[in-house]
Amino acid sequence: MQTLEGGALRLSRRHMLRGLALTSAALVLPGHRAVAAPGPRQDPETTWRAFVTGLPKAELHMHVEGVVDPWLAFELAERNGLRLAHASPAAFARTLTFDSLESFLRGYGQMLDVLRTGEDFHDATLTYLERARAENVLYAELHFDPQAHVNRGIAFEEVVDGIRSACASAERDLGIGSRLIMALQRDLDVESARAVYASALARRDDIVGLGLDNYEEPGFPAKFEALFREAAAEGFRLTSHCDLEVPDSVEHVRGCIELLGVDRLDHGYSVVESEALTALCRARGIGLTACPTTDWNHPDPLEDYYVAAVTRSVGRMLELGLRVSLNTDDPGLMGGRYLTDVMVDTRRALDLGIDELVTLSRNAFESTWAPEEERRGWLAALDAYVDDRAPAVPG
Protein backbone atom coordinates (compact mmCIF):
# COMPACT_ATOMS: atom_id res chain seq x y z
CA MET A 1 0.00 0.00 0.00
CA GLN A 2 1.29 3.44 -0.89
CA THR A 3 2.18 5.57 2.13
CA LEU A 4 2.02 9.32 2.30
CA GLU A 5 3.71 9.95 5.63
CA GLY A 6 6.90 11.45 4.27
CA GLY A 7 5.12 14.18 2.34
CA ALA A 8 2.34 14.87 4.79
CA LEU A 9 1.59 18.43 5.84
CA ARG A 10 2.82 19.08 9.37
CA LEU A 11 0.20 21.25 10.99
CA SER A 12 1.18 23.26 14.06
CA ARG A 13 -1.81 21.94 16.00
CA ARG A 14 -0.70 18.40 15.25
CA HIS A 15 2.51 18.70 17.25
CA MET A 16 0.59 19.96 20.25
CA LEU A 17 -1.93 17.11 20.04
CA ARG A 18 0.78 14.50 19.60
CA GLY A 19 2.42 15.75 22.78
CA LEU A 20 -0.88 15.47 24.62
CA ALA A 21 -1.48 11.99 23.31
CA LEU A 22 1.96 10.71 24.30
CA THR A 23 2.34 12.37 27.71
CA SER A 24 -1.09 12.71 29.34
CA ALA A 25 -1.15 10.82 32.63
CA ALA A 26 -4.85 10.15 32.18
CA LEU A 27 -4.39 7.79 29.24
CA VAL A 28 -4.78 4.07 29.80
CA LEU A 29 -3.70 1.24 27.53
CA PRO A 30 -4.91 -2.34 27.91
CA GLY A 31 -2.87 -4.07 30.61
CA HIS A 32 -2.02 -0.84 32.42
CA ARG A 33 -3.63 0.88 35.38
CA ALA A 34 -4.41 4.58 35.56
CA VAL A 35 -2.27 6.72 37.83
CA ALA A 36 -3.81 10.02 38.86
CA ALA A 37 -1.27 12.74 39.66
CA PRO A 38 -2.00 14.60 42.93
CA GLY A 39 -3.23 18.14 42.54
CA PRO A 40 -5.28 20.89 44.13
CA ARG A 41 -8.91 20.34 45.06
CA GLN A 42 -11.11 20.79 41.98
CA ASP A 43 -14.70 21.84 41.52
CA PRO A 44 -17.09 18.98 40.63
CA GLU A 45 -17.42 19.79 36.92
CA THR A 46 -13.64 19.92 36.51
CA THR A 47 -13.38 16.58 38.28
CA TRP A 48 -16.05 15.09 36.02
CA ARG A 49 -14.24 16.37 32.91
CA ALA A 50 -10.97 14.86 34.08
CA PHE A 51 -12.70 11.53 34.70
CA VAL A 52 -14.35 11.52 31.27
CA THR A 53 -11.14 12.58 29.51
CA GLY A 54 -9.25 9.64 30.95
CA LEU A 55 -12.12 7.16 30.54
CA PRO A 56 -11.15 4.55 27.90
CA LYS A 57 -13.43 5.20 24.94
CA ALA A 58 -14.28 4.02 21.43
CA GLU A 59 -15.88 6.03 18.65
CA LEU A 60 -18.08 4.40 16.03
CA HIS A 61 -19.68 7.32 14.20
CA MET A 62 -17.45 9.99 12.76
CA HIS A 63 -16.79 11.04 9.18
CA VAL A 64 -13.28 11.74 7.92
CA GLU A 65 -14.62 14.57 5.78
CA GLY A 66 -16.26 16.10 8.86
CA VAL A 67 -12.93 16.39 10.70
CA VAL A 68 -12.04 19.43 8.59
CA ASP A 69 -12.67 22.58 10.62
CA PRO A 70 -12.43 26.15 9.26
CA TRP A 71 -8.77 26.45 10.24
CA LEU A 72 -7.73 23.18 8.61
CA ALA A 73 -9.90 24.10 5.60
CA PHE A 74 -7.85 27.27 5.08
CA GLU A 75 -4.57 25.34 5.34
CA LEU A 76 -5.67 22.70 2.84
CA ALA A 77 -7.14 25.32 0.50
CA GLU A 78 -3.83 27.18 0.45
CA ARG A 79 -1.91 24.00 -0.28
CA ASN A 80 -4.27 23.17 -3.15
CA GLY A 81 -4.37 26.68 -4.60
CA LEU A 82 -8.04 27.21 -3.69
CA ARG A 83 -9.66 30.44 -2.57
CA LEU A 84 -12.38 30.15 0.06
CA ALA A 85 -15.29 32.57 0.14
CA HIS A 86 -14.50 33.71 3.68
CA ALA A 87 -12.16 36.39 5.04
CA SER A 88 -10.77 34.16 7.79
CA PRO A 89 -11.33 30.84 9.55
CA ALA A 90 -13.25 32.64 12.29
CA ALA A 91 -15.53 34.24 9.70
CA PHE A 92 -16.00 30.82 8.12
CA ALA A 93 -16.96 29.34 11.51
CA ARG A 94 -19.63 31.99 12.01
CA THR A 95 -21.40 30.74 8.86
CA LEU A 96 -21.63 27.19 10.18
CA THR A 97 -25.04 27.38 11.82
CA PHE A 98 -27.28 24.38 11.18
CA ASP A 99 -31.04 24.16 11.61
CA SER A 100 -31.68 21.18 9.30
CA LEU A 101 -29.97 18.28 7.57
CA GLU A 102 -29.93 20.38 4.40
CA SER A 103 -28.10 23.32 6.01
CA PHE A 104 -25.63 20.92 7.59
CA LEU A 105 -24.88 19.21 4.28
CA ARG A 106 -24.20 22.58 2.66
CA GLY A 107 -21.51 23.25 5.25
CA TYR A 108 -20.25 19.70 4.88
CA GLY A 109 -19.86 20.26 1.14
CA GLN A 110 -17.60 23.26 1.71
CA MET A 111 -15.27 21.21 3.90
CA LEU A 112 -15.33 18.29 1.50
CA ASP A 113 -14.22 20.51 -1.39
CA VAL A 114 -10.78 21.25 0.10
CA LEU A 115 -9.92 17.53 0.24
CA ARG A 116 -8.21 16.99 -3.11
CA THR A 117 -5.29 14.56 -2.63
CA GLY A 118 -4.34 11.49 -0.67
CA GLU A 119 -2.14 13.73 1.45
CA ASP A 120 -5.20 15.80 2.39
CA PHE A 121 -7.08 12.69 3.50
CA HIS A 122 -4.04 11.53 5.44
CA ASP A 123 -3.77 14.84 7.28
CA ALA A 124 -7.48 15.11 8.07
CA THR A 125 -7.52 11.55 9.40
CA LEU A 126 -4.38 12.01 11.49
CA THR A 127 -5.74 15.27 12.92
CA TYR A 128 -8.73 13.34 14.23
CA LEU A 129 -6.79 10.34 15.52
CA GLU A 130 -4.28 12.46 17.41
CA ARG A 131 -6.98 14.52 19.07
CA ALA A 132 -9.02 11.42 19.86
CA ARG A 133 -6.03 9.63 21.38
CA ALA A 134 -5.33 12.68 23.57
CA GLU A 135 -8.79 12.03 25.07
CA ASN A 136 -8.08 8.31 25.57
CA VAL A 137 -10.05 7.03 22.61
CA LEU A 138 -8.47 3.61 22.14
CA TYR A 139 -10.28 2.66 18.94
CA ALA A 140 -12.32 4.35 16.20
CA GLU A 141 -14.30 3.24 13.17
CA LEU A 142 -14.01 5.96 10.54
CA HIS A 143 -16.70 6.61 7.94
CA PHE A 144 -15.71 7.99 4.54
CA ASP A 145 -17.83 8.92 1.51
CA PRO A 146 -16.07 7.74 -1.67
CA GLN A 147 -18.80 8.74 -4.13
CA ALA A 148 -18.37 12.38 -3.12
CA HIS A 149 -14.70 12.14 -4.11
CA VAL A 150 -14.84 9.81 -7.11
CA ASN A 151 -17.46 12.10 -8.63
CA ARG A 152 -14.94 14.96 -8.33
CA GLY A 153 -12.27 13.00 -10.18
CA ILE A 154 -10.34 11.70 -7.16
CA ALA A 155 -9.43 8.03 -7.41
CA PHE A 156 -10.94 5.64 -4.87
CA GLU A 157 -7.49 4.21 -4.17
CA GLU A 158 -6.03 7.64 -3.41
CA VAL A 159 -8.72 8.31 -0.82
CA VAL A 160 -8.32 4.94 0.90
CA ASP A 161 -4.52 5.01 0.76
CA GLY A 162 -4.45 8.44 2.38
CA ILE A 163 -6.78 7.46 5.20
CA ARG A 164 -5.13 4.09 5.82
CA SER A 165 -1.66 5.66 5.90
CA ALA A 166 -2.76 7.93 8.74
CA CYS A 167 -4.41 5.02 10.56
CA ALA A 168 -1.20 3.00 10.37
CA SER A 169 0.87 5.93 11.67
CA ALA A 170 -1.50 6.54 14.57
CA GLU A 171 -1.60 2.89 15.57
CA ARG A 172 2.20 2.62 15.46
CA ASP A 173 3.02 5.94 17.17
CA LEU A 174 0.04 6.53 19.47
CA GLY A 175 -1.54 3.14 20.08
CA ILE A 176 -5.00 4.00 18.74
CA GLY A 177 -6.60 1.34 16.57
CA SER A 178 -9.01 2.07 13.71
CA ARG A 179 -10.96 0.53 10.86
CA LEU A 180 -12.86 2.01 7.91
CA ILE A 181 -16.56 2.10 7.06
CA MET A 182 -17.45 2.98 3.48
CA ALA A 183 -20.57 5.14 3.46
CA LEU A 184 -22.84 5.06 0.42
CA GLN A 185 -25.03 8.05 -0.37
CA ARG A 186 -28.74 7.25 -0.07
CA ASP A 187 -29.80 9.91 -2.56
CA LEU A 188 -27.61 8.62 -5.41
CA ASP A 189 -28.56 5.72 -7.65
CA VAL A 190 -27.66 2.14 -6.84
CA GLU A 191 -25.40 1.91 -9.89
CA SER A 192 -23.16 4.59 -8.39
CA ALA A 193 -23.08 2.66 -5.12
CA ARG A 194 -22.22 -0.57 -6.92
CA ALA A 195 -19.27 1.09 -8.67
CA VAL A 196 -17.56 2.04 -5.41
CA TYR A 197 -18.63 -1.26 -3.84
CA ALA A 198 -16.65 -3.07 -6.54
CA SER A 199 -13.62 -0.99 -5.56
CA ALA A 200 -14.20 -1.83 -1.90
CA LEU A 201 -14.14 -5.55 -2.64
CA ALA A 202 -10.57 -5.11 -3.83
CA ARG A 203 -9.71 -3.42 -0.50
CA ARG A 204 -11.53 -5.88 1.73
CA ASP A 205 -8.72 -5.92 4.29
CA ASP A 206 -8.96 -2.13 4.71
CA ILE A 207 -12.75 -1.72 4.93
CA VAL A 208 -14.67 -3.49 7.69
CA GLY A 209 -18.18 -2.28 6.93
CA LEU A 210 -20.67 -0.45 4.73
CA GLY A 211 -23.07 2.30 5.73
CA LEU A 212 -25.62 4.70 4.25
CA ASP A 213 -25.73 8.47 4.76
CA ASN A 214 -26.52 11.82 3.09
CA TYR A 215 -30.10 12.90 2.28
CA GLU A 216 -32.71 10.51 3.70
CA GLU A 217 -35.01 9.67 0.81
CA PRO A 218 -38.39 7.99 1.38
CA GLY A 219 -38.13 4.21 1.35
CA PHE A 220 -34.36 4.10 0.99
CA PRO A 221 -33.89 0.70 2.74
CA ALA A 222 -35.67 -1.17 -0.06
CA LYS A 223 -33.48 0.61 -2.61
CA PHE A 224 -30.29 -0.87 -1.14
CA GLU A 225 -31.61 -4.23 0.06
CA ALA A 226 -30.00 -6.36 -2.66
CA LEU A 227 -26.62 -4.65 -2.40
CA PHE A 228 -26.53 -4.96 1.38
CA ARG A 229 -27.38 -8.65 1.22
CA GLU A 230 -24.47 -9.15 -1.19
CA ALA A 231 -22.17 -7.18 1.10
CA ALA A 232 -23.21 -9.25 4.12
CA ALA A 233 -22.42 -12.42 2.18
CA GLU A 234 -18.93 -11.02 1.53
CA GLY A 235 -18.42 -10.49 5.25
CA PHE A 236 -18.92 -6.73 5.48
CA ARG A 237 -20.60 -5.42 8.63
CA LEU A 238 -23.56 -3.12 8.02
CA THR A 239 -24.95 0.14 9.36
CA SER A 240 -27.14 2.99 8.17
CA HIS A 241 -27.97 6.52 9.18
CA CYS A 242 -31.56 6.98 10.36
CA ASP A 243 -31.92 10.66 11.11
CA LEU A 244 -33.97 12.68 13.57
CA GLU A 245 -37.36 14.15 12.67
CA VAL A 246 -37.58 13.10 9.04
CA PRO A 247 -40.73 11.67 7.40
CA ASP A 248 -41.27 7.94 7.95
CA SER A 249 -38.34 7.75 10.38
CA VAL A 250 -39.80 4.81 12.32
CA GLU A 251 -40.42 2.85 9.12
CA HIS A 252 -36.89 3.63 7.95
CA VAL A 253 -35.51 2.17 11.18
CA ARG A 254 -37.69 -0.90 10.66
CA GLY A 255 -36.52 -1.24 7.05
CA CYS A 256 -32.87 -0.93 8.00
CA ILE A 257 -33.25 -3.74 10.52
CA GLU A 258 -35.55 -6.06 8.56
CA LEU A 259 -34.53 -5.41 4.94
CA LEU A 260 -30.91 -4.32 5.22
CA GLY A 261 -30.00 -6.52 8.18
CA VAL A 262 -27.89 -3.83 9.85
CA ASP A 263 -25.66 -4.57 12.83
CA ARG A 264 -25.84 -0.95 13.97
CA LEU A 265 -27.96 2.17 13.43
CA ASP A 266 -26.28 5.56 13.12
CA HIS A 267 -28.46 8.00 15.06
CA GLY A 268 -31.60 5.82 15.04
CA TYR A 269 -33.39 7.91 17.66
CA SER A 270 -36.85 6.99 16.38
CA VAL A 271 -36.42 3.46 17.70
CA VAL A 272 -37.70 4.68 21.08
CA GLU A 273 -41.06 5.50 19.47
CA SER A 274 -41.81 1.81 18.84
CA GLU A 275 -41.92 -0.88 21.52
CA ALA A 276 -41.55 -3.54 18.83
CA LEU A 277 -38.40 -1.95 17.39
CA THR A 278 -36.97 -1.40 20.85
CA ALA A 279 -37.45 -5.08 21.64
CA LEU A 280 -35.94 -6.06 18.29
CA CYS A 281 -32.84 -3.92 18.86
CA ARG A 282 -32.36 -5.41 22.31
CA ALA A 283 -32.83 -8.97 21.06
CA ARG A 284 -30.33 -8.54 18.22
CA GLY A 285 -27.84 -6.44 20.18
CA ILE A 286 -28.01 -3.65 17.61
CA GLY A 287 -25.76 -0.73 18.49
CA LEU A 288 -27.09 2.83 18.24
CA THR A 289 -24.49 5.53 17.62
CA ALA A 290 -25.94 8.75 19.02
CA CYS A 291 -24.39 12.12 18.16
CA PRO A 292 -25.70 14.99 20.33
CA THR A 293 -23.66 17.54 18.37
CA THR A 294 -24.12 21.25 17.77
CA ASP A 295 -22.47 23.90 15.56
CA TRP A 296 -19.91 26.68 16.01
CA ASN A 297 -22.47 29.24 17.18
CA HIS A 298 -23.94 27.76 20.37
CA PRO A 299 -21.78 28.75 23.37
CA ASP A 300 -23.77 26.31 25.49
CA PRO A 301 -24.55 23.19 23.43
CA LEU A 302 -27.49 22.34 25.69
CA GLU A 303 -29.30 25.40 24.34
CA ASP A 304 -29.29 23.84 20.86
CA TYR A 305 -32.69 22.29 20.06
CA TYR A 306 -31.05 19.38 18.23
CA VAL A 307 -28.71 18.57 21.11
CA ALA A 308 -31.62 18.69 23.56
CA ALA A 309 -33.74 16.36 21.41
CA VAL A 310 -30.94 13.86 20.84
CA THR A 311 -29.91 13.93 24.48
CA ARG A 312 -33.47 13.11 25.57
CA SER A 313 -33.40 10.15 23.19
CA VAL A 314 -30.08 8.98 24.63
CA GLY A 315 -31.56 9.10 28.12
CA ARG A 316 -34.54 7.07 27.00
CA MET A 317 -32.30 4.53 25.23
CA LEU A 318 -30.33 4.05 28.44
CA GLU A 319 -33.55 3.53 30.38
CA LEU A 320 -34.69 0.93 27.84
CA GLY A 321 -31.42 -0.99 28.02
CA LEU A 322 -30.44 -0.31 24.41
CA ARG A 323 -26.81 -0.47 23.30
CA VAL A 324 -26.39 3.26 22.76
CA SER A 325 -23.02 5.00 22.52
CA LEU A 326 -21.94 8.63 22.17
CA ASN A 327 -20.03 9.91 19.14
CA THR A 328 -18.85 13.13 17.49
CA ASP A 329 -20.18 12.66 13.92
CA ASP A 330 -18.34 15.63 12.32
CA PRO A 331 -16.19 17.35 14.95
CA GLY A 332 -14.71 19.90 12.55
CA LEU A 333 -18.16 21.15 11.60
CA MET A 334 -19.68 20.66 15.03
CA GLY A 335 -17.95 23.39 16.97
CA GLY A 336 -14.65 21.52 17.33
CA ARG A 337 -16.27 19.31 19.97
CA TYR A 338 -14.67 15.91 20.39
CA LEU A 339 -15.82 12.94 22.44
CA THR A 340 -14.98 14.29 25.89
CA ASP A 341 -17.05 17.42 25.19
CA VAL A 342 -19.99 15.34 23.97
CA MET A 343 -19.89 13.03 26.98
CA VAL A 344 -19.48 15.86 29.49
CA ASP A 345 -22.41 17.80 28.04
CA THR A 346 -24.60 14.68 27.95
CA ARG A 347 -23.73 13.97 31.58
CA ARG A 348 -24.65 17.54 32.49
CA ALA A 349 -27.96 17.41 30.59
CA LEU A 350 -29.12 14.06 31.96
CA ASP A 351 -27.40 14.24 35.36
CA LEU A 352 -25.64 10.97 34.60
CA GLY A 353 -23.47 9.23 37.15
CA ILE A 354 -20.42 7.03 36.80
CA ASP A 355 -22.46 3.91 36.05
CA GLU A 356 -24.22 5.51 33.08
CA LEU A 357 -21.01 6.99 31.65
CA VAL A 358 -19.26 3.65 31.94
CA THR A 359 -22.25 1.95 30.30
CA LEU A 360 -22.01 4.35 27.35
CA SER A 361 -18.32 3.57 26.96
CA ARG A 362 -18.87 -0.16 27.42
CA ASN A 363 -21.65 -0.09 24.81
CA ALA A 364 -19.26 1.50 22.33
CA PHE A 365 -16.58 -1.16 22.83
CA GLU A 366 -19.14 -3.96 22.65
CA SER A 367 -20.58 -2.52 19.42
CA THR A 368 -17.25 -2.34 17.59
CA TRP A 369 -16.50 -4.52 14.61
CA ALA A 370 -13.11 -5.47 15.99
CA PRO A 371 -12.06 -9.02 16.89
CA GLU A 372 -13.23 -10.32 20.26
CA GLU A 373 -9.71 -10.39 21.67
CA GLU A 374 -9.30 -6.66 21.05
CA ARG A 375 -12.67 -5.91 22.64
CA ARG A 376 -11.75 -7.88 25.76
CA GLY A 377 -8.54 -5.87 26.13
CA TRP A 378 -10.35 -2.54 25.88
CA LEU A 379 -13.05 -3.61 28.33
CA ALA A 380 -10.37 -4.72 30.79
CA ALA A 381 -8.76 -1.28 30.50
CA LEU A 382 -12.15 0.32 31.13
CA ASP A 383 -12.72 -1.76 34.27
CA ALA A 384 -9.22 -1.00 35.58
CA TYR A 385 -9.68 2.72 35.05
CA VAL A 386 -13.01 2.79 36.85
CA ASP A 387 -11.59 0.84 39.79
CA ASP A 388 -8.79 3.40 40.13
CA ARG A 389 -10.60 6.64 39.44
CA ALA A 390 -14.26 6.28 40.41
CA PRO A 391 -13.75 6.91 44.16
CA ALA A 392 -12.40 10.41 43.39
CA VAL A 393 -15.46 11.47 41.37
CA PRO A 394 -18.37 13.31 43.06
CA GLY A 395 -21.42 11.17 43.79
Task: Name each model feature, range by range.
Residues 28-30:
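Hydrophobic alpha-helical segments of integral membrane proteins
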Residues 39-238, 244-251, 255-264, 270-287, ...:
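Metal-cofactor-binding active-site regions of metalloenzymes
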Residues 13-17:
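N-terminal export leaders
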Residues 6-7, 33, 384, 388:
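Short linear motifs in intrinsically disordered/low-complexity regions
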Residues 18-22:
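Sec-dependent signal peptide recognition
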Residues 1-12, 24-26, 35:
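N-terminal secretory signal peptides
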Residues 32-38:
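Signal peptide processing junction and immediate N-terminal pro/mature segment
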